[in-house]
């Protein structure tokens, strides 16, 4: 097989909100396809009408587009093996089941769960062992009798009486002993196809060569290999694909990261202001590393280096602090104009308005770019520029606006009122002359009260630049208002 013939797939079910573990799987598949020059197939497994939703389907499209994980075949792109939504492929599955039955690879099974348990008990076995392959040996007359009773059979695959083994690209040689996996259902009693059928069936028909998926699906692999082998014998499949079972993503402690964990929600990270580059870099580290001493890399660098054989099989813990730190680095790496545009879009999306024209906003953005972890942090630093959101934090006032702040504010107001021009340089010169030289104050004592009076907090962008952005009138108005409150109960 040439590398360009590699075909991988990402095939989520449209239920709930996209999960970071799911996105990690999509990323590894996408990166492997791009690294090999192969094809990335996006397929929707929407055969569970009770749980699937159009809202979740659209959320999946939104997630992949936001992250920049483009697909070569799939919804809204199409391709030679469509349709790419399983709900639109029902007739294909019925045809495959019919061929499996005709070839003797599958059979109708009428046993109820209660009957299976009763047979296990009668034989002295654990009643929870699962299906016992009883219906394999039914005669035509027995099947006819069951049908006459009104029973609706499921269709089961006839499992081979040999070990099922494969070389997992992540976990190495893996074997399930003969007889350890019973004949499994391919359809419901209604005739509707089950995941156990449609997933391998679609992989075969779409000529998937490599299956990269979560470790939680490892137990289903022997069943799927058996089905691939049956599909090969009836001329539907060309091969059994290579398998790579990716390590579990853990949350707190040793528990698997679940949908109930806040950090599992992809859109929660986007809402906080993660940028795609930062989040993808961190998710790539959940099982893979570009180098032992190198955690920061671009998507292009990942594509150039990624080989699924290098993925570690050990569970990977989602560390929010490390994710934040990596995102902060990627924000710093952005071109200033790019960062400015992204910050503007983020603030607009979240209803955060600043009274700044484009030029002033660009200045403000550059001031905060190296001071934030996520885009959300920028609003906390810049909201003082919005009069409706400006307020002096009581803790900041208690720290910086005590009685001894009065003379400092008086001197600052006088100095700024006399500044010829309202530029950062003029503001800095006026305040340093009045407070550092004139009053012999240390910078913290000199500028702390001014920062709190102007921005409402002890943490802000650089003070002199902040005052220039705020403007002469608003800056002096806030300083005077704060001076009036100094020393009051």
Swiss-Prot record:
Predominant location category: cytoplasm
Compartments where located: Cytoplasm
InterPro entries noted in UniProt: aa-tRNA-synth_I_cd-bd, aa-tRNA-synth_I_codon-bd_sub2, aa_tRNA-synth_I_cd-bd_sf, Glu-tRNA-ligase_bac/mito, Glu-tRNA-synth_I_codon-bd_sub1, Glu/Gln-tRNA-synth, Glu/Gln-tRNA-synth_Ib_cat-dom, Glu_tRNA_lig_a-bdl
Cysteine-cysteine disulfides: none
Residues annotated as binding ATP: 259
GO BP annotations, alphabetical order: glutamyl-tRNA aminoacylation
Motif residue range(s): 'KMSKS' region: 256-260
Xref: SUPFAM superfamilies: An anticodon-binding domain of class I aminoacyl-tRNA synthetases, Nucleotidylyl transferase
Motif segment ('HIGH' region): 12-22
Top-rank lineage group of the source organism: Bacteria
GO molecular function term, any single one: glutamate-tRNA ligase activity
Catalysed reaction equations from the record: tRNA(Glu) + L-glutamate + ATP = L-glutamyl-tRNA(Glu) + AMP + diphosphate
Protein EC: 6.1.1.17
Gene Ontology CC: cytosol
Statement: the UniProt record of this protein carries the keyword Cytoplasm: yes
Keyword vocabulary terms for this entry: Aminoacyl-tRNA synthetase, ATP-binding, Cytoplasm, Ligase, Nucleotide-binding, Protein biosynthesis
Broadest EC class assigned to this enzyme: ligase
Annotated function: Catalyzes the attachment of glutamate to tRNA(Glu) in a two-step reaction: glutamate is first activated by ATP to form Glu-AMP and then transferred to the acceptor end of tRNA(Glu).
Record note on quaternary structure: Monomer.
HAMAP family recorded: Glu_tRNA_synth_type1
Protein name: Glutamate--tRNA ligase
Annotated source species: Mycobacterium marinum (strain ATCC BAA-535 / M)
Gene: gltX
């Amino acid at each position: 097989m040439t590398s360009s013939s590699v075909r991988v797939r990402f095939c989520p079910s449209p239920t709930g909100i996209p999960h970071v573990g799911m996105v990690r799987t999509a990323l590894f598949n996408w990166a492997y396809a791009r690294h090999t020059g192969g094809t990335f197939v996006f397929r929707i497994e929407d055969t569970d009408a009770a749980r699937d939703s159009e809202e979740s389907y659209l959320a999946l499209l939104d997630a992949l587009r936001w992250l920049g994980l483009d697909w070569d075949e799939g919804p809204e792109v199409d391709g030679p093996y469509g349709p790419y939504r399983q709900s639109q492929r029902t007739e294909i599955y019925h045809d495959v089941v019919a061929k499996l039955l005709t070839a003797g690879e599958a059979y109708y099974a009428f046993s109820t769960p209660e009957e299976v348990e009763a047979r296990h008990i009668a034989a002295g076995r654990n009643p929870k062992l699962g299906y016992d392959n009883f219906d394999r040996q039914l005669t035509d007359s027995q099947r006819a009798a069951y049908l006459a009773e009104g029973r609706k059979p499921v269709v089961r695959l006839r499992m081979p009486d040999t070990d099922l083994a494969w070389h997992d690209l992540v976990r190495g040689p893996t074997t399930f002993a003969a007889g350890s996996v019973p004949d499994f259902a391919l359809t419901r009693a209604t005739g509707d196809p089950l995941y156990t059928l449609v997933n391998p069936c679609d992989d075969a028909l779409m000529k998937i060569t490599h299956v990269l998926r979560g470790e939680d699906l490892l137990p289903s692999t022997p069943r799927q290999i058996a089905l691939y082998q049956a599909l090969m014998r009836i001329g539907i499949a060309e091969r059994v694909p290579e398998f790579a079972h990716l390590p579990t993503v853990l949350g707190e402690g040793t528990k698997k990261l679940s949908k109930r964990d806040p950090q599992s929600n992809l859109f929660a990270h986007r809402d906080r202001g993660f940028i795609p580059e930062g989040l993808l870099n961190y998710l790539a580290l959940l099982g893979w590393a570009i180098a032992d001493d190198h955690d920061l890399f671009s998507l292009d660098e990942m594509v150039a280096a990624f080989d699924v054989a290098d993925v570690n099989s050990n569970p990977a813990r989602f560390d929010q602090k490390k994710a934040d730190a990596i995102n902060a680095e990627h924000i710093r790496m952005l071109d200033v104009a790019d960062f400015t545009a992204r910050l503007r879009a983020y603030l607009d999306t979240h209803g955060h308005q600043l009274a700044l024209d484009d030029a002033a906003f660009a200045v403000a953005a550059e001031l905060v770019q190296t001071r934030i972890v996520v885009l959300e942090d920028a609003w906390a630093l810049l909201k003082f520029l919005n009069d409706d959101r400006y307020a002096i934090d009581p803790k900041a006032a208690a720290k910086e606006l005590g009685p001894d702040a009065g003379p400092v504010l008086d001197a600052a107001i006088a100095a700024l009122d006399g500044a010829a021009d309202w530029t950062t340089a003029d503001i800095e010169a006026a305040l340093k002359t009045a407070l550092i030289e004139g009053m012999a104050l240390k910078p913290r004592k000199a500028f702390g009260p001014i920062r709190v009076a102007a921005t409402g907090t002890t943490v802000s962008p650089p003070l002199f630049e902040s005052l220039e952005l705020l403007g002469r009138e608003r800056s002096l108005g806030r300083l005077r208002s704060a001076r009036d409150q100094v020393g009051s109960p």
